[in-house]
Amino acid sequence: MKKIAIILVVSLCCLQSVLAQDGTKMEAENANYSNCKLINDKKYSGGKALELTDENARINFSYQAPERGKYTIHVGYDALYGPKMVNVTVNGSTFSFQTGNTVMEEAEVGTFFMNQGANSIVITPSWTWFRIDYIRIEKGGSTLEFDIAANPVDTHASDAARTLYTFLYENFGKKTISGIMTGDMTTANGNVTQHADVQAVYKASGKYPALVGFDFMNATGKSGNSSWNKSYTTASIKLAEDTYKRGGIPAFTWHWRDPSRRTDAFYTADCNMKITDAMNADGTWNTSSALYANIIKDIDTVADYFLSMQSKGMACVFRPLHEASGGWFWWGREGAVPFVKLYRLVYDEMVNVKGVHNVIWIWNAGENDRDWNPGDNYYDVVSADIYNNDFDYSSNYVSFDKLKTLTKGKKIIALSENGPIPDIEREFEEEAVWSWWMPWYQTWNGKFVDKTSTAEWKKCMNDSRVITLNDLAGWDVYATIEIPTATNATRQEIYDLQGRRLFSVPSKGFYIMNGKKFLK
């Protein structure tokens, strides 16, 4: 008691740090704050809270960590008038979380790396009009281990898709695949290394990205049959084919234009498209409706492009219905239940009806999107879209950990859209090794390559833990082989693509060959 009394006399701020190390609370009113209103009310811890109604409001806690490591931060808040977005910045790395509708609640924000000694924890509003009561810090984080399936969810996946999935599976946690999104399609003439967006990465780093993003946004919709739209999609497919031929990974997104054909829009604000307009009152699909017919027609159009690539022995990754929980695209307008039904319809129509088996499926999720999960059997990879401030090379490990928890460690995790690239040292140091990252395009005045410095581009792209197109010898050097069951045999013979015997293996299963390396 004497020691505590001395601390109280010296500094209340120091008491905050000592108590927090024991997992207790740090009161908001005892932190350094500005542009906040102090609220006196006995319902709050300590009888006080800070109200954030000013967009410039700021609460800065100083936490003395006993050692470097992971710490889980909880925030006690009062949402006042419904859900709000709250920013929590730890030593310069920002993570945003959404409050619930509950008036007073404690939220687990996430697990953060902290240094031994002083650490800055800053709370600011993304949306105003809420109150912060306290934060609570606990040592340690999730101990969840990865347990990822060795095969894609499509049980009839093509050899090319199995090979691609195995490539992602074997490299996950060991290396990160570099990527770039493409926008403009008026140049390059089918040579992906000459595309302006790919060239921007090459000019900044001296190497080409291994994964290249394309968009089906002009393949369907009210103007889908226009010559310009068709030429855009055709150019994209040619570049995807060239990417694959060079050993790279084509990654497709689909900004799905209004299937009702009333507009050419995909943003919620620009169209009235509702998924439920194609459903019966009981939530089943109204298969006789015109809207349902248009939805199927659009899905089949995209499926046919995949089938064309499938016939050429290609495989791709595909991220349909992205960023749904944000609500800014029509497929997220009505919430999780209609979204899940639409995602499953896209998958079932493509895979089970059309026979598309050359796709690795991505569910693009928010960190707390449990209700939006289409089901573990409908996707291979979970991904996040994160745009840090320019030249902020954070690993975004909080989001990585959230997605790991969301999928119970059973899925590969990718950064499917980003601004600045994550620093490779921080990815490994902070245990957030994304399967791949993909900055948005440089063309169309996007300039997303410029949001990473040339020095950082060179550092990351020349690191042995980052896979570039320069590192890949081409998919024809890989072979995925199903070993037949042999009742009396103890080993199975392995041959290369030219029929030459390489060696034997002791068991049946799917194997992948990469040069001299042989993996099960």
Go through each PLM region and give its residues:
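Aromatic- and acid-rich polysaccharide-binding/catalytic face
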Residues: 369-391, 440
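C-terminal outer-membrane/trafficking sorting elements
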Residues: 479-520
